[in-house]
Amino acid sequence: MSETITVNCPTCGKTVVWGEISPFRPFCSKRCQLIDLGEWAAEEKRIPSSGDLSESDDWSEEPK
């Protein structure tokens, strides 16, 4: 028998079974999934970067 894997919902912390029984995994519900999406869209969450964000200053559409 295989062991049932569970994770915590990243939004509310509720336990979620990792499998086809949970269509919104790792979220417990569509609501928690949409809350998380909204946080990313509002830039409340971001992936840390070690690079300098000013790299785009060197980009130009005009040939040098």
Swiss-Prot record:
- Per UniProt, the ranges with Acidic residues bias are 54-64
Q: Which region ranges are annotated with the description Disordered?
A: 45-64
Spell out the molecular function terms from Gene Ontology.
Answer: DNA topoisomerase type II (double strand cut, ATP-hydrolyzing) inhibitor activity; zinc ion binding
Q: Which UniProt keywords apply?
A: Metal-binding, Zinc
Q: Name one GO biological process term.
A: regulation of DNA-templated transcription
Cofactor remark from the record: Binds 1 zinc ion.
Please give the Gene3D superfamilies that the UniProt record associates with this protein.
Answer: Erythroid Transcription Factor GATA-1, subunit A
Family stated for the protein in its record: Belongs to the DNA gyrase inhibitor YacG family.
What's this protein's name?
Answer: DNA gyrase inhibitor YacG
User: What organism is listed for this UniProt entry?
Assistant: Escherichia fergusonii (strain ATCC 35469 / DSM 13698 / CCUG 18766 / IAM 14443 / JCM 21226 / LMG 7866 / NBRC 102419 / NCTC 12128 / CDC 0568-73)
